[in-house]
């Protein structure tokens, strides 16, 4: 080929590249014209968001149904209270109201549908059902005795859950082993049974290597008594075993991964869990295929004609659903981060011809039992978005014993005052200030950087560096403090002396704190920051009474000022002063 001859290969590649760019631009304009929003989790709405959402929903329903709908009134004022009730009485009334409205706290149901429905009709029915569900929760929020935690408010996220529940034979609810009941949603299990009575719900207790063996035994007994299908599992340990690595975290229990004789308390490995999931799902498939008469009445008939079992993973954000699937598949197929809400759409992964896994995005279910700060400390809500860090740190301080915090971080927390309960947990301010002082975290203002310290402590709490776990209902909590000796506090307040006959002669010389000492401690109490520094204040040295008088001020000489005379003009006068002539020293001749 000569130099004068030209080819069109390069020009064709450039045209193809420009064509692909133009197609991507047109595709973006198409989605923009459809006003298609990015799928993300929404747990809280502001005033303007609620107004816009209310207007959009009302306009859609009016356009479709040609009738005015009841406006969505969302009460965003959560601080209003019409009466002042004692704290204990208010808690009792709150428990009664929660038990009374427990049945109203449901997962939104998908309305019935058929393949003959159009896309617009199905979309309108789902939005109407979701709007009715939101109104029901708003009516619960209007009750002053009920505190509803943040929950998922994005309809598209709930649609992902509906699809996973419909196509799954075995539904695996992933929970955190340190508090399984906090992450369990009983109404989700009831909804799965409403879709198909032959569907099974399995509780996958993840992060089980953070629990001692005796605690796992108690939880296994609780699950058996309540007829709950459960399996203990550790996604991090399974991934490390698959990659041939050794866990470096000292806070994880290495002895827990050893095989035990009891299959209920053992921590399953990758192959064992796959076999268990396939066995449970195949049992459901056999029952499903035997119902030939009822197949025609189902709207998803195509799913019933297959022999492949589908296992769906559902649960709260950041409990380890995607990590579990990656460990079961054997490679990273789903995104995993410490920030909740990484998974946006449900994904199907084929393990074999007989088993398929389905990963669902994490959802925050509505509940009464927890607070917003407890959800942040549990990793359900993002840590980086919190605005009040002391409340979330107080949750950590209440659940982790004082000696454990001091041992893990190698710090010394301030001791309680004499008038306080000696077994009380440390305050959030005490923990944050001690942590910042030991690490040298200082903000630009010169004060301790409590925000940075709070984020690091919360991440250690979620990751397991700060060991904590809850016990089953009806059993004493771990590291429960002893009952406070109230008689000792009464003796301190009354200034009474200790019992000489019981203690002996040695106690006669000991100083028993009296009412003056208690008042001195009360004077060091700061309402804004909890407690002041524990430095000893030295008393001022008293002087003699005859030396306490104030000396009169020395009178200054102001004779140079002009007196108020008739000839005076108010200006200072200049006195004529003639310096004597210096004739020098006298010389003797």
Swiss-Prot record:
Record domain CP-type G: where: 158-366
Residue segments, region G4: 206-209
Gene3D superfamilies xrefs: 1.10.1580.10, P-loop containing nucleotide triphosphate hydrolases (3.40.50.300)
Annotated source species: Arabidopsis thaliana
Domain notes per entry: In contrast to other GTP-binding proteins, this family is characterized by a circular permutation of the GTPase motifs described by a G4-G1-G3 pattern.
Sorted UniProt keywords: Cytoplasm, GTP-binding, Hydrolase, Nucleotide-binding, Nucleus
Region (G1): 315-322
SUPFAM superfamilies: P-loop containing nucleoside triphosphate hydrolases (SSF52540)
Protein name: GTPase LSG1-2
Traits of the deletion mutant: No effect on the association with 60S pre-ribosomes, but altered rRNA processing and accumulation of 18S rRNA precursors. Embryo and leaf developmental defects. Severe delay in development of the first true rosette leaves and frequent fused or triple cotyledons. Lsg1-1 and lsg1-2 double mutants are lethal, when homozygous.
Chain intervals with Basic residues compositional bias: 534-558
Sequence positions that bind GTP: 206-209, 318-323, 362
Main location: cytoplasm
Tissues where this protein is expressed: Ubiquitous, with the highest expression in reproductive and strongly dividing tissues.
Biased composition (Polar residues): 580-589
GO cellular component assignments: cytosol; nucleolus; nucleus
Protein location: Cytoplasm; Nucleus
Function (record text): GTPase involved in ribosome biogenesis. Binds to 23S rRNA and associates with 60S pre-ribosomes. Involved in early cotyledon and leaf development.
Ranges where the record places region G3: 359-362
Xref: InterPro entries: G_CP_dom, GNL1-like, GTP-bd, GTP-bd_ortho_bundle_sf, P-loop_NTPase
């Amino acid at each position: 080929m000569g130099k004068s001859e030209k080819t069109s290969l390069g020009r064709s590649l450039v045209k193809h590249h420009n064509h692909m760019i133009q197609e991507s631009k047109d595709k973006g304009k198409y989605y923009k014209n459809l006003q298609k929003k990015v799928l993300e989790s929404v747990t809280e709405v502001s005033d303007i968001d609620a107004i816009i959402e209310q207007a959009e929903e009302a306009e859609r329903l009016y356009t479709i149904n040609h009738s005015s709908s009841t406006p969505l009134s969302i009460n965003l004022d959560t601080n209003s209270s019409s009466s002042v009730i004692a704290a204990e009485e208010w808690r009792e009334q709150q428990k009664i109201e929660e038990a009374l409205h427990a049945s109203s706290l449901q997962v939104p149901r998908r309305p019935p549908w058929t393949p003959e429905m159009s896309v617009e009709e199905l979309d309108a029915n789902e939005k109407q059902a979701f709007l009715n569900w939101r109104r029901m929760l708003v009516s619960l929020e209007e009750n002053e005795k009920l505190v509803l935690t943040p929950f998922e408010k994005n309809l598209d996220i709930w649609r992902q859950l509906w699809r996973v529940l419909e196509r799954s034979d075995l539904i695996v609810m992933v929970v955190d082993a340190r508090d399984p009941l906090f992450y369990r949603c009983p109404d989700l299990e009831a909804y799965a049974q409403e879709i198909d009575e032959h569907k099974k719900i399995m509780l996958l207790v993840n992060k089980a290597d953070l629990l001692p063996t005796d605690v796992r035994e108690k939880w296994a007994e609780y699950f058996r008594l309540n007829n709950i299908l459960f399996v203990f599992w550790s996604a991090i340990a399974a991934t490390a075993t698959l990659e041939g690595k050794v866990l470096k975290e000292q806070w994880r229990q290495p002895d827990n991964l050893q095989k035990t004789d009891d299959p209920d308390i053992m921590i399953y490995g990758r192959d064992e869990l796959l076999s268990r999931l396939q066995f449970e799902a195949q049992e459901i498939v056999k029952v499903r295929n035997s119902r030939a008469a009822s197949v025609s009445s189902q709207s998803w008939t195509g799913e019933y004609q297959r022999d492949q079992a589908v296992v769906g993973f559902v649960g709260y954000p950041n409990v380890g659903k995607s990590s579990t699937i990656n460990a079961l598949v054997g490679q990273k197929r789903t995104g995993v981060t410490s920030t909740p809400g990484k998974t946006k759409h449900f994904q199907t992964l084929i393990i074999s011809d007989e088993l398929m896994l389905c990963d669902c995005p994490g959802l925050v279910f509505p509940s009464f039992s927890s607070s917003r700060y407890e959800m942040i400390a549990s990793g359900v809500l993002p840590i980086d978005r919190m605005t009040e860090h002391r409340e979330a740190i107080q949750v950590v301080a209440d659940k982790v014993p004082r000696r454990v915090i001091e041992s893990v971080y190698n710090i010394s927390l301030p001791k309680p005052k004499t008038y306080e309960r000696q077994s009380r947990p440390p305050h959030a301010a005490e923990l944050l200030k001690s942590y910042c002082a030991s690490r040298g975290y200082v903000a630009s203002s010169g004060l301790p950087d409590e925000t940075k310290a709070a984020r690091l402590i919360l991440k250690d709490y979620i990751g397991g560096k700060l060991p904590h776990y809850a016990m089953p209902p009806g059993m004493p909590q771990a590291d429960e403090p002893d009952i406070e000796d109230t008689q000792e506090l009464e003796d301190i307040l009354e200034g009474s002396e200790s019992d000489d006959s019981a203690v002996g002669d040695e106690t006669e010389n000991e100083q028993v704190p009296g009412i003056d000492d208690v008042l001195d401690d009360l004077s060091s109490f700061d309402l804004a920051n909890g407690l002041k520094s524990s430095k000893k204040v030295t008393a001022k040295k008293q002087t003699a009474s005859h030396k306490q008088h104030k000396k009169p001020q020395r009178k200054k000489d102001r004779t140079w000022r002009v007196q108020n005379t008739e000839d005076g003009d108010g200006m200072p006068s200049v006195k004529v002063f003639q310096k004597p002539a210096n004739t020098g020293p006298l010389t003797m001749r």
